[in-house]
Amino acid sequence: MGKFEVLDHPLIQHKLTMIRDKRVGTKVFRETVKEISTLMAYEVSRNMPLKDVEVETPIAKTTQKELAGKKVAIIPILRAGLGMVDGMTELIPAAKIGFIGMYRDEETLKPHEYFVKLPNDITERQLFIVDPMLATGGSAVMAIEALKKRGCQEKNMKFACLVAAPEGVKAVQEAFPDVDIYTAGLDERLNEDGYIVPGLGDAGDRLFGTK
């Protein structure tokens, strides 16, 4: 069973409170989402494997640790997921970036896939799927399905979001029990329009200044 973790680091919680405030404008919202994403990358990558390597310092030879195992690919769910990419690559600059485009039917609340572009070696990588909001879980489930259709395995996937609703967490866990889920905040519920309560509004609109 994959893990579900609410990242309670004080800086993450402080910055999440900042972007919940409806008075925060696009510039500060975008910058703070990037900062939270960098902090989340630290936590999401915590269990990446290490191996021993020989290093010669200016003083002596020594055995130290470096990353081993699979290289990373960051997969934002468009469009809002783009807001988390720069923060993630601050810590993992060599990561490749893939893209999965989704839009939500405002009547049915169902997601529709319109674009997929992934690195050629995607099946050989550890995948960090990012989307600021995990609401109904529909987009996350569809994104994971798209990756599985292309040969990726659940055990190599981690999903990271800023805010999650219990309904979305349940949907992903039931569909893909081996996918780890990380969130900065677990909120109360969804409202009748499918928005997270209390949430932070429409993350895409607030990131890009659209309506």
Swiss-Prot record:
Its EC number is 2.4.2.9. 5-phospho-alpha-D-ribose 1-diphosphate binds at R79, R104, D131, P132, M133, L134, A135, T136, G137, G138, S139, D202. It comes from the Bacteria. Binds 1 Mg(2+) ion per subunit. The magnesium is bound as Mg-PRPP. Its cofactor is Mg(2+). One of its GO terms (biological process) is uracil salvage. Allosterically activated by GTP. It is an enzyme of class 2 (transferase). Uracil binds at I196, G201, D202, A203. Keywords: Allosteric enzyme, Glycosyltransferase, GTP-binding, Magnesium, Nucleotide-binding, Transferase. It catalyses: UMP + diphosphate = 5-phospho-alpha-D-ribose 1-diphosphate + uracil. InterPro entries: PRibTrfase_dom, PRTase-like, Upp_B, UPRTase/APRTase, Ura_phspho_trans. It holds the Pfam family UPRTase. Catalyzes the conversion of uracil and 5-phospho-alpha-D-ribose 1-diphosphate (PRPP) to UMP and diphosphate. NCBIfam families: PRK00129.1 (NF001097), upp (TIGR01091). Belongs to the UPRTase family. This is Uracil phosphoribosyltransferase.
